[in-house]
Amino acid sequence: MNTRVGTIGNASLLTADAHPMIDPFGRAVTYLRVSVTDRCDFRCTYCMAENMTFLPKKDLLTLEELDRLCSAFVAKGVKKIRLTGGEPLVRKNIMYLVRRLGEKIGAGLDEVTLTTNGSQLSRHAEELYDCGVRRINVSLDTLDPDKFRKITRWGDFAKVMEGIDAAQKAGIKIKLNAVALKDFNDAEMPEIMRFAHGRGMDLTVIETMPMGEIDEDRTDQYLPLSKLRADLEKQFTLTDIDYQTGGPARYVRVAETGGRLGFITPMTHNFCESCNRVRLTCTGTLYMCLGQNDAADLRAALRATEDDALLHAAIDEAITRKPKGHDFIIDRTHNRPAVARHMSVTGG
């Protein structure tokens, strides 16, 4: 295979396919999720405590450092980068990083995308498209403005709708993500699905995950998606399809709407056997698994020298520790999360 090496930032990027990182179980790691901030302008009850303590800003990597880290991963075979948070679009000057990552598309990287709550989309949609972002995920758990305010604690539903409108107008494809919550939005799922499919958007429903101490009781929130699917099949014809986006969702086609519906089931049917991702936090911590605590400190290697050899070695060592699967359980006895850190730190 012929390759040509170019340089973006401090890391070398291969303009042809780099050899992918392979974990101990033979899985290629080609997907990097980057939590650019732990801060969010919402406080969704299943994700955060109301009075969260956030990381001191001095502890965060600079956007230039995040760019350098991402470049190193692209040089090591990562094809897709997703920016997450917290809420990624509340990070000051975040579009600098988006633009830098967009410049890597076609130079080793296939796609830059992000997951957002939609609150800042109306301001950034056109620039996101200009930077090379072609599809995003928007988290939306209800279409009822009052319920939306309750679940987010103070979110503005109208602002999110404006953001979705702006993104679609800019040419960005949207997939809606909805966390399935018992006795909150389970009865509303048909309406959410019709809304999404009516606007040309896929909908993915997600089981709540036991991460971080929150004010709510997760045993009260938890809804197995097997039950949700059974309920939906009383009204709709769902046919399993072989459609993949590089993530863990298993998709069906809904005959009555013509749209796609995805199920992400970390609790009832985990997706670990095909896991292709690692997660980088805004402090330079690399988590090899969403549901495990083992992590690698890449910040030390990043700041030790301007040469990337030490950083590449640290990444290689971390990949050798990627586990076979997660340890998610809903602890009904002690009501403790399976993982102490909040989703907003890891980025989902």
UniProtKB/Swiss-Prot annotation:
Gene3D superfamilies: Aldolase class I. The keyword Thylakoid does not apply. Keywords: 4Fe-4S, GTP-binding, Iron, Iron-sulfur, Lyase, Metal-binding, Molybdenum cofactor biosynthesis, Nucleotide-binding, S-adenosyl-L-methionine. [4Fe-4S] cluster 2 binds at C272, C275, C289. Binds 2 [4Fe-4S] clusters. Binds 1 [4Fe-4S] cluster coordinated with 3 cysteines and an exchangeable S-adenosyl-L-methionine and 1 [4Fe-4S] cluster coordinated with 3 cysteines and the GTP-derived substrate. One of its GO terms (biological process) is Mo-molybdopterin cofactor biosynthetic process. Residues 24-242 form the Radical SAM core domain. It is an enzyme of class 4 (lyase). [4Fe-4S] cluster 1 binds at C40, C44, C47. SMART domains: Elp3. It catalyses: GTP + AH2 + S-adenosyl-L-methionine = (8S)-3',8-cyclo-7,8-dihydroguanosine 5'-triphosphate + 5'-deoxyadenosine + L-methionine + A + H(+). GTP binds at R33, R82, T115, K175, R277, V278, R279. Transmembrane segments: none annotated. Belongs to the radical SAM superfamily. MoaA family. Monomer and homodimer. This is GTP 3',8-cyclase. It comes from Rhizobium leguminosarum bv. trifolii (strain WSM2304).
